[in-house]
Amino acid sequence: MATPSLPAGAVFRVSRGNFDPARFAEVDQMTRDTGSYLIPAIRQLDGLIGYYAGTSEEGSTVHVSLWRSHEDAQQMSRLKEMIVDARGASEAVGVSFIPIVNYPIAWII
């Protein structure tokens, strides 16, 4: 398997939230529904390499994205569809978020 090539300075951004596992169906549906407006908005941002979102029955939801640089990743902290619309939808179904972190990439396979 070939090792992927990433630009120097690439980072991945992790946004994670927790919720009552009894609300899994609601949170999972909300995650899918918010994709209808998050995907087109995020695709417009410079520096996006990849984006993944998922929800676990164990009471956790996560968004992991890969960016060319820390500055590119920081666009997410200003994206209305994320910080207003999706956050409101998430909180409405009981999701509480932990601080978002951008991680410089140490190694890849």
What residues fall within each predicted segment?
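Short S/T/G/P-rich N-terminal loop/turn motif that feeds into the first structured element of a domain
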Residues: 1-61, 68-81, 88-109
